[in-house]
Each structure stands twice: as C-alpha cells, then as structure tokens.
Curated annotation (Swiss-Prot):
SUPFAM superfamilies: Homeodomain-like
Complexes and interactors: Forms a heterodimer with ALPHA2.
Subcellular compartments: Nucleus
Highest taxon listed in the record's lineage: Eukaryota
GO molecular function list: DNA binding
Listed name of the protein: Mating-type protein A1
The entry's keywords: DNA-binding, Homeobox, Nucleus, Repressor, Transcription, Transcription regulation
Start-end of DNA-binding region: 88-147
Segments forming a coiled coil: none
Known function: Mating type proteins are sequence specific DNA-binding proteins that act as master switches in yeast differentiation by controlling gene expression in a cell type-specific fashion. Transcriptional corepressor that acts in conjunction with ALPHA2 to repress transcription of haploid-specific genes. Required for induction of sporulation in diploid cells.
Residues spanning the membrane: none
Family designation: Belongs to the MATA1 family.
Main location: nucleus
Amino acid sequence: MPSRTPTDIWRCQRLILAARKGETTCQALHEQSIEISSSLKWFEEISEWMSKFPESGLYISTTIWTFLEGVPNEHRIKYDRLIRHYITYIQQLVPARLVTAYLDSLFKICSHPTRTERRIIGEHCGISLHQVTQWFTNRRFREPKTDSPDDGSTRFIPSPMTSPGSIDECSFPESP
C-alpha cells in the first residue's frame, strides 16, 4: 500500500474539520474560495495604491524634498542619493508588511493550503513557492496548541516502585 503524502494528509484533515463543523467539503471549499478572492482583491487594491508613490511624484511635496530645494547642487547630489535610497527602503519595507498581513489573513482561512493554492499565493505576492511554504510552516509552528486538555502542567503518575509502601510488595528478579 502506498504511503500517504502530506497533501493527502491535509485533505483528510480538511474533510475531518468540515465534517466536525457540519458542512460538506464543497461548501467549505466554496467559502474558502470566496474569502481568498476577497482578500486577494484587498491585496491588489493596496498594492495598486502603494505603487502610485514612486511613479506619480507624490513624494516631491514632502518636507525632505522641500529641504533639498535650498541645498547647493554639489551637495544636493549626495542628499538626493541618500533620500532615494531611504525612499526605496521604505517602499520595499511597506509591501513586505502588506504581504505578511495578506498571508496572515489567508492563514486564518486555511492553515494548510494545497500546492496549487501556495503557487497562486506566491504569484500574487511576488514570492517563491518555497517562501510561501516556509511562511505557512513557521506560522503553524507559532500557532498556540489547543489540543492539550490541561493548561500545560505536566502530571506525575507515580510508579509502583516510587509509591510509599511499595518496596515490600515488589519482587526483584534474581541475578544469574
């Protein structure tokens, strides 16, 4: 009998979770696809909004660029490079946070996406399939475990050897 791949195990987990919730798999997948498409629309709107900043020249009116108007040309080149470097850093930093927020919203919908879903997510975010897989793996690891019945305290069950009065009742094997 062939061994189960992780994808098969995740499908089984999805079926079990859907059965526990009292919904069919088709309903669960349909609801997931609606939530994923709505979050994708949000991500595209935010990405479009963020892409306007470097091209449209909106940053020219900021105080940094106003400050550069009074600087002589020989010094302005140095400041210009530094500010462009800083703006590029901010532009790279903000989309990374948007990607994290987007992936986090998708994690709330489905913590075990299929390979096809991960590939699509990677294409939308501009990251590789491996990065998406690693992100979901790390996020699942950080997720608090809810399976334990108690608050994490370990129980000690004494063995017959350590319980009081058990020395007399124990029988030791004879040495050869």
